[in-house]
């Protein structure tokens, strides 16, 4: 099984790229954000806890994140590989993932870091709208946002509570203080490929696929 990690700050496009690249390379796509949102929708104690952290722009504690993600990964048996989007987000999570994969006779094949400047991240996130049905993202000013409908499924659009300018800045502060060290962690292992996230979306996709194939 070939496992790939996507690193990048909120708004870097790693979610969009993860879906596209997973489809192109026939890999499973696991987005931590989606797992958390499903937990919130369940309305149980775990979901309420996750919701409280996300609304404050804080990272969900390691012990909760690790438990949720590893449980999901254990159920993905009939796949050729996995793209992990949004996990790990701390060195502790990375070490827990390494340990779990070793126990399964697996490892990390390549780590993709999508690099986008901070001011651009704030602009992207503050203007992001999301479909309530399929979670497709849109930017303020586009036709879909003007109409208030998703072009994929016709679902209604909304702005997430954690996409306000104030919360966005806090999320980025948390990211760069707690998650950025992962870049050096994986670089030291010779697994990291840094991709310029300011390029056209299609070009970013090409560069990511090339990096993954070269890393095999």
UniProtKB/Swiss-Prot annotation:
It catalyses: AMP + ATP = 2 ADP. Keywords: ATP-binding, Cytoplasm, Kinase, Metal-binding, Nucleotide biosynthesis, Nucleotide-binding, Transferase, Zinc. GO terms for cellular component: cytoplasm. Residues 31-60 are annotated as: NMP. Pfam families: ADK. Monomer. It is found in: Cytoplasm. InterPro entries: Adenyl_kin_sub, Adenylat/UMP-CMP_kin, Adenylat_kinase_CS, P-loop_NTPase. Residues 127-163 are annotated as: LID. This is Adenylate kinase. Signal peptide: none annotated. GO terms for biological process: AMP salvage. Its EC number is 2.7.4.3.
